[in-house]
Amino acid sequence: MAIIPLAQLNELTISSSSSSFLTKSISSHSLHSSCICASSRISQFRGGFSKRRSDSTRSKSMRLRCSFSPMESARIKVIGVGGGGNNAVNRMISSGLQSVDFYAINTDSQALLQSSAENPLQIGELLTRGLGTGGNPLLGEQAAEESKDAIANALKGSDLVFITAGMGGGTGSGAAPVVAQISKDAGYLTVGVVTYPFSFEGRKRSLQALEAIEKLQKNVDTLIVIPNDRLLDIADEQTPLQDAFLLADDVLRQGVQGISDIITIPGLVNVDFADVKAVMKDSGTAMLGVGVSSSKNRAEEAAEQATLAPLIGSSIQSATGVVYNITGGKDITLQEVNRVSQVVTSLADPSANIIFGAVVDDRYTGEIHVTIIATGFSQSFQKTLLTDPRAAKLLDKMGSSGQQENKGMSLPHQKQSPSTISTKSSSPRRLFF
C-alpha cells in the first residue's frame, strides 16, 4: 500500500496540469478509482457524529492513504504451446513475472517434464502417445482437438489469455490456433504472442509458420508476431546459437509482461482491465516495441528507442490503438513519465485509442523501460513484413526519414552496437517487431 503526503499529492496534480493527457490518466485511473482516504475509513467504521467530526479534524494532518490495487484483479493465464511456447513460459517464470497463471501444453511428455509451469497439460495422448508430432502441424491440430475438453477446463475462469508459441513446428503451429479458438469462443480476451522462425531454419518451417499464423489470426483478438531474424540486428556476431533462441524467448516474455504488468502491478498510473480490453479486443495484428535506457536523458531515449525502432515511423502512425507501459525504480519522476508520454503521443495518430501505465519496480532502479503495443494493422501488412525483408527495410528507411521530416526532429536512428544487448548498459536499447 502506497502512502503519499496530501501536500505532495496536491503538488503532483498541479504540476502535471501542463500535460492534459497525463493528468487525465492519473486522475481518472489512480486517484478517482483507487485512492481511499484514511478519513473516509475512520468515518465509515466509527459511529457518532461528534466522533466523526473529531476524527475528520484530526485527519487533516494525516497522510492520504491510497491503495492502487483493485478489489478484484483480472485473472490472467499464459498458455505456452509446443516446445517454443514451453521455453517462453519457463523464461517468464524465471524472470519473476507475477500475478499470472502459467500453463504448458505439449504432445511430448518428456518436454513437459522440463517445464517450470505449475499446470502442465499433455494433449493428444491417444494420437501421439506422448512422443510429439515430428514437426507435423496437422498432428498438432488433431492432438488439440482430441483434448479440447481438457484445454477448455484449463482456460475456465480467465479474463485474459495469452497464447505463446514458436510458429513453424508441429505442436505450436497446429495446436495454438485450436487453443485460441477455444479461448475466444468462451469470451476471454485472447492475445497471441508468437515467433516467426529464423531464415536458416528452412523454407518448409517458414511456410508452416505462415499457415499457422493465418489460422491463429482468425481466432485471437490481438496477434503479435516476432520475426526471429530481427534479433540478428541486436545480437552480437559472436552470440551462441542457444543464446539467440533465449533472446527470442525473452522477447516473448517482454510482450506478455508489458501488457500484464499494466493490469496487475500497482502503479503510479493505474490502468484497469477494461481499458486494456478496449484497445486490444478484435484489434487484429499488433507490433511490439521495447526501449531501455539508464543514461542522463533516459526517459526520452527509452521512448525514442521504443518508437523509432524499425517500422515504427509507419506503424505507430497507422495504429488504431496503442498500449504502453513505463517501468522504473523508485527514482523515476513524474516529469520523466510525462516526457515518455509526450514522445509517444506526438507520434501516434490523434484518433488512436491510447492507454498507458506507469509502474515502480525496485529491480529497475537507475533504468527506465518502455514497452509499446501498437494495434490495428491488417494481416496483409504483417505478411509483407514476414515474407519480404527488402520491403521491410524500405519501410524502415522511409519511416525513419519521414518521421524526422514531418516532426521536425533530428532523432538518432543508428545501428545497434553489440554492447547494447546488455541489460545494464548506459546506452539505450531498442526492439520493434
From Swiss-Prot:
Function per UniProt: Exhibits GTPase activity. Component of the plastid division machinery that forms a contractile ring at the division site. Required for plastid division in a dose-dependent manner. Involved in epidermal plastids division in a MINE1-dependent manner. Involved in blue light-induced chloroplast movements. May regulate thylakoid development. In the vegetative shoot apex, at the shoot apical meristem (SAM), where the proplastid-to-chloroplast transition takes place, contributes equally with FTSZ2-1 in the L2 layer to plastid division.
Family classification: Belongs to the FtsZ family.
Residues bound to GTP: G83, G84, G85, N86, N87, G170, T171, G172, E201, R205, D249
Consequence of gene loss (knockout): Highly heterogeneous chloroplast population with giant chloroplasts and some smaller. Impaired chloroplast division, some green cells with one single big chloroplast. Abnormal thylakoids. Increased plastid volume in young leaf primordia and in the shoot apical meristem (SAM), including the central zone as well as peripheral zone of L1, the outermost layer, the peripheral zone of L2, and the peripheral zone of L3.
One GO MF term: GTPase activity
Source species, domain of life: Eukaryota
Recorded topology in the membrane: Peripheral membrane protein
Gene: FTSZ1
Protein name: Cell division protein FtsZ homolog 1, chloroplastic
Pfam families: FtsZ_C, Tubulin
Expression sites by tissue: In pollen grain, restricted to plastids of vegetative cells. Also present in pollen tubes plastids.
Transit peptide: 1-66
Protein localization: Plastid, Chloroplast stroma; Plastid, Chloroplast thylakoid membrane
Region described as Disordered: spans on this chain: 399-433
Gene Ontology biological process terms from the UniProt entry: chloroplast fission; chloroplast organization; chloroplast relocation; microtubule-based process; plastid fission; response to blue light
Residues the record lists as N-acetylserine modifications: S67
One Gene Ontology cellular component annotation held by this UniProt entry: chloroplast
Residue stretches in coiled coil: none
Keywords carried by this UniProt record: Acetylation, Cell cycle, Chloroplast, GTP-binding, Membrane, Nucleotide-binding, Plastid, Thylakoid, Transit peptide
Taxonomic source organism: Arabidopsis thaliana
Low complexity bias spans: 414-433
NCBIfam families (UniProt xref): ftsZ
Subunit structure: Aggregates to form a contractile ring-like structure; contraction of the ring was accompanied by an increase in the filament turnover rate. This aggregation is regulated in midchloroplast stroma by MIND1 (repressor) and MINE1 (promoter). Self-interacts and binds to FTSZ2-1 in heteromers to form two morphologically distinct types of filaments, termed type-I (smooth filaments) and type-II (rough filaments), in a GTP-dependent manner. Interacts with ARC3. Part of a complex made of ARC3, ARC6, FTSZ1 and FTSZ2.
Outcome of mutating R298Q: Reduced accumulation, heterogeneous chloroplast population
